[in-house]
């Protein structure tokens, strides 16, 4: 057989050659909408590759972006990698010290950014010591700052051949959100990225085809936008990109562009569902949503199912490129009751080919796949980290297993269910209480917009759960109503010893609930009557 390295620019070539007229729509932050296609994107990416070489970039150099989702950002992905560089997507929601650290640690040479982030860029320039070229994607007409992207690539004709090489060369770099310590870099290879894309388009994963219209609500700066910028050119599907995540704008975009497939974290779906419930709007021909980043509440899954929209519950992390599991339908799906289907979808799904999972106890002994036993979740596979960028030591054990930091159960059919993060499990009387399951049950209570459960020290039980709740707008739900709702949904001894109401919960730069910040906020909190334990005495 021929030697045909799995380099990701072959995906762009394929989309250009076989699906050149496939449309790419960009909804910009200023409300404007632009349209292009795979052929034009590929041509402009070649022009950008020429522009990068003209400013002295070489194979392996890092090219950074600080931008939302739009076609110029997509062009930058392909142009940077096509000239042999490594694309480093920077999350603008990080703290200044983190932005300082990752750009310098990555030794970025070029930064392309959105005008909306210009104040941030100007503030950080003195601290970014390795970047010598700054390009603005979308400057206003009276812009007096860095060179505009279109002007930068204008002198180049696009007569360019992508840099070839080994499929194990790096092509992408993402940093973890760094909830403790400095963020860590994860370096992606051409081969791992290609295999991830091939797995992602399968029916049991994102189920994309040429006839799909995909809209990732995942930012392109977060975990490779869940791989959709590579899965889309593989199929040649139409791609809709939005820099504006306001729910009314998103719902309008779904409907007008005929979006069939989408992916996002629960918080963004919550805002869209609330908008639809308040206005009577709809999501058009949407067929499939993928929900990940944190566990999707059963109430959310049920909301989509009642509207004929398939829910793929996913799990992954920056270290897994990011897809690790996805909830495609099992073989006996049609024989399941509605309640059984809902329960199955609430799990994080099964692995695609290329990924392996197991759970172990604290001594490293493998635990059974019985759907009941929980343990530390380990993963290995074709697109799983081996070591962090610029780290000498391996991130895995001798057999290649990476400790995810999650606690999970694996069912006999292979379906995995996250029960908690290892550091978020509430340890009460020698037993584990899943904060995730408690939170998801609470969110199903009318009037509860968001909920978080954390462990509070207790003199008898070690820890007991505190439930922190954000009410829905205009709702007057109280602790009694929430406790009544939870009765029968969780074990009685899981019931929170107190419920506190707040205006908002803290989130990380990637939109996940920050239990660390929440624990800091309630560090001195103690239950009013610590000896009167509901359901335990």
Which sequence ranges carry the predicted segments?
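Conserved beta-loop-beta connector loops within the AMP-binding
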Residues: 351-378, 412-413, 475-479, 514
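Conserved adenylate-forming
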Residues: 52-57, 156-168, 173-215, 227, ...
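Gly/Ser/Thr-rich phosphate-binding loop
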Residues: 234, 256-264, 270-342, 356, ...
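Conserved AMP-binding/adenylate-forming core of the ANL superfamily
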Residues: 24-70, 74-78, 95-100, 150
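AMP-dependent adenylate-forming
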Residues: 11-37, 141-144
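AMP-binding/adenylate-forming catalytic core of the ANL superfamily
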Residues: 65, 94, 111-115, 262, ...
């Amino acid at each position: 057989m021929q030697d045909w390295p799995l380099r990701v620019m072959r995906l762009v070539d394929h989309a250009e050659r076989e699906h050149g007229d496939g449309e790419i729509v960009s909804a910009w932050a200023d409300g404007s909408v632009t349209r292009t296609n795979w052929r034009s994107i590929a041509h402009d990416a070649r022009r950008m590759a020429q522009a990068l070489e003209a400013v002295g970039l070489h194979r392996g150099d890092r090219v950074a972006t600080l931008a939302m989702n739009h076609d110029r950002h997509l062009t930058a992905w392909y142009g940077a990698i096509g000239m042999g560089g490594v694309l480093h997507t920077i999350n603008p929601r990080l703290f200044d010290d983190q932005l300082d650290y990752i750009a310098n640690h990555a030794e970025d040479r070029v930064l392309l950014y959105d005008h909306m982030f210009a104040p941030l860029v100007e503030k950080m320039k003195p601290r970014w010591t390795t970047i010598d070229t700054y390009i603005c994607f979308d400057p206003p007409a009276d812009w007096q700052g860095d060179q505009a992207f279109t002007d930068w690539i204008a002198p180049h004709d696009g007569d360019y051949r992508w840099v070839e090489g080994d499929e194990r060369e790096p092509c992408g770099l993402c940093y973890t959100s760094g909830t403790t310590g400095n963020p860590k870099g994860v370096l992606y290879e051409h081969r791992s990225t290609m295999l991830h894309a091939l797995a992602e388009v399968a029916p049991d994963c994102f189920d994309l085809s040429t006839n799909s219209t995909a809209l990732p609500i995942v930012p392109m700066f977060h975990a490779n936008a869940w791989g959709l910028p590579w899965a889309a050119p593989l199929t040649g599907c139409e791609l809709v990109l939005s820099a504006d995540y306001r729910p009314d704008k998103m719902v309008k975009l779904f409907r007008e562009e005929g979006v069939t497939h989408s992916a996002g974290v629960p918080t963004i779906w919550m805002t869209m569902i609330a908008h639809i419930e308040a206005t009577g709007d709809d999501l058009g021909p949407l067929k499939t949503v993928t929900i990940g980043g944190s566990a999707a509440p059963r109430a959310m899954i049920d909301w989509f199912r009642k509207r004929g929209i398939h829910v793929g519950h996913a799990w992954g992390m920056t270290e897994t490129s990011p897809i690790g599991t996805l909830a495609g339908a099992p073989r006996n799906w049609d024989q399941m009751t509605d309640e059984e289907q809902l329960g199955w979808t609430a799990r994080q799904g099964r692995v695609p080919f290329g990924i392996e999972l197991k759970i172990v106890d604290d001594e490293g002994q493998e635990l059974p796949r019985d759907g009941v036993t929980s343990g530390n979740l380990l993963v290995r596979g074709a697109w799983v980290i081996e070591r962090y960028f610029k780290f000498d030591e391996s991130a895995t054990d001798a057999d290649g297993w990476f400790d995810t930091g999650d606690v999970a159960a694996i069912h006999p059919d292979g379906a995995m269910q996250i029960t908690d993060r290892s550091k978020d499990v509430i340890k009460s009387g020698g037993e584990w209480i899943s904060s995730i399951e408690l939170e998801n049950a609470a969110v199903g209570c009318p009037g509860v917009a968001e909920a978080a459960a954390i462990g509070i020290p207790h003199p008898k039980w070690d820890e007991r759960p505190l439930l922190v709740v954000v009410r829905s707008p205009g709702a007057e739900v109280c602790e009694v109503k929430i406790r009544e709702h939870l009765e029968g949904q969780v074990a009685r001894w899981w019931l929170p010893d107190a419920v506190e109401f707040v205006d908002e919960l803290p989130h990380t730069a990637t939109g996940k609930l920050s239990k660390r910040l929440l624990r800091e906020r309630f560090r001195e909190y103690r239950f009013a009557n610590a000896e009167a334990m509901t359901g335990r005495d």
